[in-house]
């Protein structure tokens, strides 16, 4: 069993590495998406703020917590800002969250981990509840993928068909 445990640890490390590689790609996509959106609605320093927001989402939602408190006052108070611009910036963020949560992350992470769209979304909810919001959201996909792979390995090793 020592060999089996070592093999599963290697599998888990591989899952973590590939997860963070894909998460980096997602963050870059989000950065360009938010940056372009903020720039298009006329937010001062919009591309920079949006890009930083996307990249900081390596820890899920961290970029939003840090960047929205900067972006929203800028949209309202700087260079003829208005409630309209503030709502446009907020709209870009909401639309980006929708795209990320339902399409970008599930597609990129779900296809490679074997979890699928629903599995990715469920894993976020489950692990955020079990480990807390920050650690749970950060490790949700690698932990779920490892659980699936471990289950398959244990099933193949210990469960024999009856028929």
Where are these regions (language model features)?
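Alpha-helical transmembrane segments and their immediate interhelical loop/hinge regions
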Residues: 1-74, 83-86
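Hydrophobic alpha-helical segments typical of transmembrane helices
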Residues: 4, 32, 103-108, 122
């Amino acid at each position: 069993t020592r060999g089996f445990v070592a093999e599963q640890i290697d599998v888990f490390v591989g899952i973590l590495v590939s997860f963070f590689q894909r998460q980096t790609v997602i963050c870059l996509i989000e950065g360009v998406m938010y940056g372009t959106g903020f720039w298009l609605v006329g937010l001062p320093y919009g591309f920079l703020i949006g890009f930083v927001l996307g990249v900081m989402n390596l820890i899920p939602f961290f970029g939003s917590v840090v960047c929205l408190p900067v972006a929203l006052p800028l949209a309202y108070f700087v260079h003829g800002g208005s409630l309209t611009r503030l709502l446009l910036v907020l709209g870009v963020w909401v639309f980006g969250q929708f795209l990320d949560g339902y399409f970008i992350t599930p597609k990129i992470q779900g296809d490679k981990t074997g979890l699928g769209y629903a599995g990715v979304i469920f894993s976020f909810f489950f692990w955020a509840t079990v480990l807390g919001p920050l650690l749970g959201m950060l490790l949700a996909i690698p932990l779920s993928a490892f659980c699936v792979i471990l289950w398959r390995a244990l099933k193949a090793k210990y469960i024999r068909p009856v028929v």
